[in-house]
Amino acid sequence: MHVNSIEAFLDALRQELEVPDHRYEQAERSYTSLANWLHRDGSTVSRYDPQVYCQGSFRLGTAIRPHTEAEEYDVDSVVELRLLTKREKTQYQLKLMLGAEIHAYHDAMDMLKPVREGNRCWILDYADGAQFHMDIVPAVPNHNQHYMLLNSLSLDTRWASTAISITDRREPNYKLLTDTWPRSNPKGYASWFASRQAIVFERRLLIATEN
């Protein structure tokens, strides 16, 4: 009885905090729209094959509902220019180049709130009714360098193929042409997270079966 009460409480809490499906759909429409813009005729970045995808809690499915209507969902996303390398541009140049496209997208979509710049990203604030903003991190592939690093440390390389390098204006080499950029791997982390969740699910299923 006690266990059932706890499970009922946790289920009620989950439903209270859970993000509605239409919010996920809204976020997906937003970064799909941005991806289409970056691939349009006349885009200054289309030749680099930009890929837009979400990261963080929205990718993991762990986002929680804001406490009040005044608070917003933070949709973290990445724009990975898959045919661009760190040998061609600095972090600063990449961020400026993508920023120009994001400003143009903002104007073309008649968005009212101005584009903001974060340390690692550009930020698009959507209309008040949408109740979310999108952080857009510029990135380039980093799978080879990341694989070699993990391999040299005898660490798991299963998810190295999706590693990226990102921009951060706080870095001392932000305006220098160098291979030393901040590293990230949101796709790899999501895959690792899913694998851990699968293990937890299997354990719970086994316990439920035994009981």
Residue spans of the language-model regions?
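Residue-level detector of short, conserved catalytic/binding motifs and their immediate flanks
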Residues: 50, 75, 122
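Long, charge-rich alpha-helical interaction segments
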Residues: 165-211
